[in-house]
Amino acid sequence: RECGDEIPVRLVKGAYWDNEIKWSQENGVTGYPVFTRKAHSDLSYIACARYLLSDDTDGAIYPQFATHNAQTIMSIEHMNETHKRRIEYQRLHGMGDNLYDTLMKQKPGMVVRIYAPVGPHRDLLPYLVRRLLENGANSSFVHKLLDADTPVDELVVHPLKTAMRHEVYANDKIPLPPAMYEERKN
């Protein structure tokens, strides 16, 4: 800030979630280092976005939001109405095209960076598969949007309301690592 430069900070959500879950299970750790419910990841992302848009970071951080989630983008846009910060969105080449095309028509000047991963095949393929799985999951906004049986009010449920539906914080459908292989110590 004192030098007049802003540090670009890229906020991502869930990029290595499956790797963290698998590592925890293979190593038999007591719990998971990541949220096991999507709503909690969504809330955490929004909380971090709120901080990145706050006066505390103005002039020091250039917020970059990597997301293909329409509700997340709308939350960020709403929070930024107050601060009017210069921000950037980022999307993976081939994902979120229609969403961002529509937004850029509605908001000329919106900065959207399209990125394409590069690297050796052994690293690149797993990365792309993770992104496809993440964005094609049944819980994704686009999947619900295309499903004629999904009520409109279910498309725009705030993640806090979704999180509050559960009595237990952790997702009980994902067994804790020590319970994975009870016959042996991981």
What name fits each language-model region?
Residues 1-185:
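Positively charged, amphipathic and often flexible ligand-engagement surfaces
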